[in-house]
Amino acid sequence: MATSVGHRCLGLLHGVAPWRSSLHPCEITALSQSLQPLRKLPFRAFRTDARKIHTAPARTMFLLRPVPILLATGGGYAGYRQYEKYRERELEKLGLEIPPKLAGHWEVALYKSVPTRLLSRAWGRLNQVELPHWLRRPVYSLYIWTFGVNMKEAAVEDLHHYRNLSEFFRRKLKPQARPVCGLHSVISPSDGRILNFGQVKNCEVEQVKGVTYSLESFLGPRTCTEDLPFPPATSCDSFKNQLVTREGNELYHCVIYLAPGDYHCFHSPTDWTVSHRRHFPGSLMSVNPGMARWIKELFCHNERVVLTGDWKHGFFSLTAVGATNVGSIRIYFDQDLHTNSPRHSKGSYNDFSFVTHTNREGVPMRKGEHLGEFNLGSTIVLIFEAPKDFNFQLKTGQKIRFGEALGSL
């Protein structure tokens, strides 16, 4: 009887003649009981040839399938991350160095495809919007609480004084808040955290321990526009040697990360003369320590402004590196500099010389003098030559404030 019922059900679905008159009452009861569980399924009704047929759409099942897939993928990734953290903790207990895990080419390309420059320009315009007087205190208080801003150091502590976020980010400090150390030859140009420092051994400079960037890619090629006497470099070592202009000197570097809650202005780290500016339009990826450990040559990918010149021991450079929502880099004495502009294309650079017929020396800067500002947190990189007995007085990861000593002879 089950076979007979099955055939007649198939006939029903294919539009065979009325079935109630041809089925035995026992068969009708059996069919009704067999179809009872199907009534609980999500059926949809539609009309075909004037007959209403109930059928479960295939799309419903398709929509349900990604849910367990996403759950399994997310759970697997979370488990993998927990395993990595456990492994790092065990290596730390054993006193072993944790090797950095670098992003692959496709991961970097995917990150660079995000329109961070456009988003940063939008953020910059939002920062210029004047806030209502009643809204300023709650907005700024939230920012202060989130990033640990010390408003007692601000020249103006009244939050209602700052008309927009941009003014708040660029707030000035009280004169006594950052005393400049006069005993050391190089001071910190900004508040921040020391990511790395030391002597440049070869053409690869460490942005953080174990992760490097190319010295020539970062500073750009030496050209005649910089008014330097030596020819273009033909190799990595020759490029480094060109930066060291005096016999017996070595090349040094220091990387300082500015967090969003830090004082956003930067100052001259020593007495020197700025002769040249090179602007690299580029991406605006995050430069926080985690990203610096993940992306090789991160500083070479990002937009940056390289200031080069001379101090009493030879070559000296300060580079302001942009980041997400930090497309605006301002140099106070350079009115022609416009960063994160749509007319600038990635992969190029723009040179400007401060040495002219009327000014053969460039722009003299005194130690501690205001030099420029970011619109939010970012990174400062110092690369300079000094005698071999130059010593940094730093520890990797330490917090530092503008005016404190970096190193001396």
Curated annotation (Swiss-Prot):
Catalytic activity: a 1,2-diacyl-sn-glycero-3-phospho-L-serine + H(+) = a 1,2-diacyl-sn-glycero-3-phosphoethanolamine + CO2
GO biological process: lipid droplet formation; mitochondrial protein catabolic process; phosphatidylethanolamine biosynthetic process; protein autoprocessing; regulation of mitochondrion organization
Localisation per UniProt entry: Mitochondrion inner membrane; Lipid droplet
Keywords assigned by UniProt, alphabetized: Cytoplasm, Decarboxylase, Lipid biosynthesis, Lipid droplet, Lipid metabolism, Lyase, Membrane, Mitochondrion, Mitochondrion inner membrane, Phospholipid biosynthesis, Phospholipid metabolism, Pyruvate, Transit peptide, Transmembrane, Transmembrane helix, Zymogen
Mitochondrial matrix side: 53-63
Site keyed Cleavage (non-hydrolytic): positions: 377-378
Details of cofactor binding: Binds 1 pyruvoyl group covalently per subunit.
Post-translational modification: Is synthesized initially as an inactive proenzyme. Formation of the active enzyme involves a self-maturation process in which the active site pyruvoyl group is generated from an internal serine residue via an autocatalytic post-translational modification. Two non-identical subunits are generated from the proenzyme in this reaction, and the pyruvate is formed at the N-terminus of the alpha chain, which is derived from the carboxyl end of the proenzyme.
Cofactor(s) listed in the protein's UniProt record: pyruvate
GO CC annotations on file: lipid droplet; mitochondrial inner membrane; mitochondrion
Record: transit peptide: 1-52
Ranges in the topological domain labelled Mitochondrial intermembrane: 83-409
UniProt record similarity statement: Belongs to the phosphatidylserine decarboxylase family. PSD-B subfamily. Eukaryotic type I sub-subfamily.
Function of the molecule: Catalyzes the formation of phosphatidylethanolamine (PtdEtn) from phosphatidylserine (PtdSer). Plays a central role in phospholipid metabolism and in the interorganelle trafficking of phosphatidylserine. May be involved in lipid droplet biogenesis at the endoplasmic reticulum membrane.
Subunit architecture: Heterodimer of a large membrane-associated beta subunit and a small pyruvoyl-containing alpha subunit.
Name of the protein this chain belongs to: Phosphatidylserine decarboxylase proenzyme, mitochondrial
Gene behind this protein: PISD
